Amino acid sequence: MALWGGRFTQAADQRFKQFNDSLRFDYRLAEQDIVGSVAWSKALVTVGVLTADEQRQLEEALNVLLEEVRVNPQQILQSDAEDIHSWVEGKLIDKVGQLGKKLHTGRSRNDQVATDLKLWCKETVRELLTANRQLQSALVETAQANQDAVMPGYTHLQRAQPVTFAHWCLAYVEMLARDESRLQDTLKRLDVSPLGCGALAGTAYEIDREQLAGWLGFASATRNSLDSVSDRDHVLELLSDAAIGMVHLSRFAEDLIFFNSGEAGFVELSDRVTSGSSLMPQKKNPDALELIRGKCGRVQGALTGMMMTLKGLPLAYNKDMQEDKEGLFDALDTWLDCLHMAALVLDGIQVKRPRCQDAAQQGYANATELADYLVAKGVPFREAHHIVGEAVVEAIRQGKPLEALPLADLQKFSHVIGDDVYPMLSLQSCLDKRAAKGGVSPQQVAQAIDDARARLAL
């Protein structure tokens, strides 16, 4: 039976019912709805709506229902209830009879669903934080094992300067640390309870909403009933967190797809995260990474869609807000899955050090070192930049790396160049000189790994 049928003289058209009902997706809020109902039953005792014995009966029945849901959540989908609130109330009435009809006193589905969703979001954020830190840990461990793997760093997808595979891993640790910080920040704003705000104007019963918030594990209660039932900022924030986080994972995936390609050949992915071709027997495709990259778009779409849904809504609750859940559930599920999959990709990855080093020695990645050498000899940097550009053109003409050019050829471009230039052009020198904080020198990379291990308690 619908929770609102008394006002109507005709039954809803079945097509409208299917269009209107939300149980097919909000069934995921079952546990939160039951937990919120237990807390609400306690609040009703404090204002004399329920006796202590009635509340005990309701709580016992709700706890039984909670266990049933945990064992078999799919049972909910066999019902024709309108939404999860209707389903829980119907099941409660089945268990305790007329007493179950007293539970909704002073409560609206508006504050009820807002509470359910915040509880679900809090739990999901904790799962995301755990997965995020697991991926950070996997990256740190991979960095630890590959501090000596020199490879080219890129700008514009052109070889630029030598870096290490460890330094590359640590770049993504930094991105994930920012994602972690955003989630922690979002969690603070999630931690206020809307329960007790009614449909929009507050509840008619003098319930202690701060006490009620505490029973549900919230830090405090919201301050304005109109805002409380219409607020979906937390949905937007989480979708934004997910969108940014998925951009980071997509870039991670794109880098590794390139590193794994025959053109680069820097890494080989485990058989456990790759697949083959139905036609070409030789293929080993990076499907896990391509799916991470591909799934980024649907998360961006969920954020954009939710913004468009909310932008024109007047206060307070509108049925449009029912559209908040499917996109949110899918986006956070997707982000969580991709965090786990990215960690799995790193488990078993093989870094091909000789190929990485060979690539780092090509493409004149040490050209900046020659410019810095000239600066140390008193040549202004802009002039040094031009000189080295000319030297690179000559090296290309001769088909040699810079360090293979004879001294006489180098001195054609600047008389200050001496024999001491050659050690400066080695890969190791290129790395060693980047010794400022955040640089790629072995000492800085080792320190960054130690710092990350300490922060992650590894």
Swiss-Prot record:
Alphabetical GO biological process terms: arginine biosynthetic process via ornithine; L-arginine biosynthetic process
Coiled coil regions, renumbered to chain: none
Pfam families documented for this protein: ASL_C2, Lyase_1
UniProt cross-references to CDD domains, sorted A to Z: Argininosuccinate_lyase
GO molecular function, one term: argininosuccinate lyase activity
Keywords associated with the record: Amino-acid biosynthesis, Arginine biosynthesis, Cytoplasm, Lyase
PROSITE patterns according to UniProt: FUMARATE_LYASES
Reactions this protein catalyses: 2-(N(omega)-L-arginino)succinate = fumarate + L-arginine
Domain of life: Bacteria
EC number: 4.3.2.1
InterPro entries in the cross-refs: Arg_succ_lyase_C, Argininosuccinate_lyase, Fumarase/histidase_N, Fumarate_lyase_CS, Fumarate_lyase_fam, Fumarate_lyase_N, L-Aspartase-like
Compartments where found: Cytoplasm
Associated pathway: Amino-acid biosynthesis; L-arginine biosynthesis; L-arginine from L-ornithine and carbamoyl phosphate: step 3/3
GO cellular component terms, A-Z: cytosol
Enzyme class per UniProt: lyase
HAMAP family, A to Z: Arg_succ_lyase (MF_00006)
Family note: Belongs to the lyase 1 family. Argininosuccinate lyase subfamily.
Protein name stated in the entry: Argininosuccinate lyase
Organism listed in the record: Salmonella dublin (strain CT_02021853)
Lineage, uppermost ranks: Bacteria, Pseudomonadati, Pseudomonadota, Gammaproteobacteria, Enterobacterales
Gene label: argH
